[in-house]
Amino acid sequence: MFWLKKFVSFWLMPVPLCLTLLIVGIILLCFSKRLRLGRGLLIAGTVLLTLFSNKLVSYALLRPIEATFPPIPEFVAGAPLSPALARCRYVVVLGSGHSDSPGFSANNQLSASALARIVEGIRILRRLPDARLITSGPGEEGFTTHAATLARVATEFGIAPERIILTETGRDTEEESQNVRALVGNAPIALVTTAWHLPRAAGLFRRAGMDVLPCPTDHLARPTKEFHLSDCDWDTNSLERSTAAVRERLGYLWVWLRRKV
């Protein structure tokens, strides 16, 4: 089921979907008599690619997901923590991705989202002296796991190794929630992950029986104070935002259908 989910979701992502429609449309126009269908597929692929790569559309798709939980605000010296955060016994940083690149420091091997997650986790952990850090993420056989790479970054930024727990077998968010549940029981946790991923992640962790404080980071569709004409542009960053929105909605649909959230 895991690989079936990955296969199906890949072909429903904006770029593979649009390219498939365009390529099949061209083939039908050039090598078959189904000209009407070919034109329809070409038009559909072009329209969808235009929409997905537009800033306004991508923001409209992603912002409602990212706005589900507010970010943890900047800490002020001497000011007390919120009761919800102060009671957390663990800070859980979910995996995202890294490259095994010899000669590069651990932080430079992390993907942009993984780096944002571990930095936010460290920021929160430093205000919780009695809490421990849990890093999550598997790795290919013979290579460093993602959890271990995150842990190396944490130690390089001053977190004592004895405060870090690794969970290295979860292939997706559902498995990560089960692994963390086995480690912490129902102890309150601060759950750190990318903002658009957090609604589904928090739902899965709560479904597993955990007391979760959502801590979003790495927002891709931050709200702005003013509207600018450039907000109507088309760019590859918009494709990234649209892809994140589609991926997360498909992921939430998958777990909802399986009654996990």
Annotate the PLM regions.
Residues 51-238, 242:
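A structural signal for short, hydrophobic/glycine-enriched beta-strand patches
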